[in-house]
C-alpha cells in the first residue's frame, strides 16, 4: 500500500492586474513547462481545477494544481520537493505572469511569498 501523506495545491493565475484592469494571460506553453518540470521530478499524477478567486475586491479565474506525494518516497528517490519546483518556475516566469506574490498550500497551511 502506498500512502500519499503530503498534499500540495499550487495557485496559478490566469490574469494579471495592470492599469486598473484584469488582463487574461496566455500561459499555455508556460504551464506546460511547469507540468514537464514536475513530471521530470517523478510527479506524474496531479489534478488541475479551474476556480473563481477573489483578491482585493477583484474576481478572476485561476488554476489549482493539486498533487499528493509520499514524503518517504520523495526522500528515498532523492526527488526535489514539488514546492521547490513550483517556486522556481513561478520566479522564472513572473515576467509573463506579472504577479506581486505567489501562493500554494501544503497540507493545512497556505504559503504566500511576495515577489516585490
Question: What does each model-identified segment do?
Answer:
Residues 1-116:
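Positively charged, small/polar-rich N-terminal and surface patches that mediate targeting and assembly
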